[in-house]
């Protein structure tokens, strides 16, 4: 499929946690939530074991980061006419940026200061 990608489209190769992959064509105007809904509505037969109950819990991961629902493929500056790899996971909520690290620092009470005598 990836060899015949239209020049105005983006081919996404989605990888599940199980390692199964499937390719889908999208417009640069499609958002992460549009993609999740499309994949849910067109769930591949060989992914049947990983079927989820709702498109709202499908999350895309690109370059190690969760994509929020309103982010478009065009905003990510993905190359047109080429294949881009993303991971697809089922997750109820997205983590807040740096929230866990901040909480850990507050709990320890550690201070990073320097005393000059």
From Swiss-Prot:
What tissues has this protein been observed in? Ubiquitous.
Q: Which residues carry this modification: Cysteine methyl ester?
A: 114
Compartment(s) where it occurs, according to its Swiss-Prot or TrEMBL record = Cell membrane
A GO cellular component annotation in the UniProt record: extracellular exosome
- Database matches in Pfam families: Rad60-SLD_2
UniProt entry tagged with the keyword Membrane: yes
Task: Kindly provide the name given to this protein in its UniProt entry.
Answer: Ubiquitin-like protein 3
Q: Which organism is it from?
A: Homo sapiens (Human)
